[in-house]
Amino acid sequence: MQAVENAPPTRDDYLSMVAGAIVDAAKRLPRPRRATGASEDSSQSLTSPSPSFEPRSWRVYGISDLHADMPTNMRWVEALPSFPARTALIVAGDVATANATTRRVLLLLKERFEEVFWVPGNHELWLPSAPNDATIRGYPDDSLGKLLSLIDVCVECGVRVGPTTLPGTSGTSGGGAADATSGPRKKKSADVVVVPVLGWYDDAFAETASVGRRTSRSREYTDLEREFDAGCKWPAAIGRPGRPRDSHADGIASFFRDVNATVWADASCRVPPAEGVDVLTFSHFVPLARVYLGTSRMARVMGSEGIGAQALGVGSTTHVFGHSHVDADDVVDVSDVRAPSAEKKSLRCRFVQNALGYPRERRGNRGAPKRVWPRDASESEGACAQS
């Protein structure tokens, strides 16, 4: 991708740059290999299967919030075992703050998983004064410039940042919310499409029904919320003019929604896919207020209903997210959110958060990559499933 010397002055310029970089990245990486058709082995562990085992179809795991700037977390990544062929990992943001650390982590993960998918969290977009990770590559001195530099890093590491089909074999496939109670089902294809959903939080998230009962619509930001992500730096084209370190501008979330729509309209990244293909989406931020299980004191910096609407609009049956460091695995009725174009898709979606988080937050095996597709028929829907 060609670097730029000066920050473009308009929102459309930034939109073209970021969406174009994602589409270009998708074209530069080879297509994933098709599953071999080897027989399944139900005795394999879901957290650390033997690397010599090759499943009949692709398996997809999810994790978020690695925060590998912390030495303890980096050692955790280094200690991860290798997973079998045809195993993919979704990394739902907050790998690290420094690009060099993010690169190291992504390379380590690519050694352990055949395919790795990534979407930026807020920590990746923190930007110190120049020279920094954005400017040394010739990109604008702001968080979107840093995102462009991170897309370059992902391409160099073989990590995917755009919608990608993991091709399976004809036969039994499963993993969507519809399978959670009925088990695997017969399909014409065992393909699965993995779709990164870029996003940012907005104030409206805290005012929706699920969170609003705990959050006053009229209250001011808490101290934690007010300075949240002051490490980011936003161009005036999408942020608040004269306040580049203010991450609360509504234009940030709407910009990323437009990036998604632009990428998904491109022929090389087009979604939704054909009928009968499962769709896995993932974001860093919380996609719906109803699946946010954290404190109301942080609700204004947690997520956006727009993320969930976009994910469900392309037919997602499983959505992986992060950010709040509160793990979840629930199947939720989303019939009130589904876009008309997706009305024939499932009206239920599985939402999974599996955060490594900070060392002080971990207990037991928390943070081990969690299998999110295909879903094992023996797994429960989760204690908080809504219907």
Description of each model-found segment:
Residues 2-119, 124-135:
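N-terminal active-site segment of His-dependent metallophosphoesterases
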Residues 67-72, 96-100, 123-134, 162, ...:
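Active-site environment of divalent metal-dependent phosphoester hydrolases
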Residues 128-144, 294-298:
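Short, flexible/disordered intra-domain loops and linkers
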Residues 178, 195-281, 285-297:
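Active-site-proximal loop/helix segment associated with metal-binding centers of metalloenzymes
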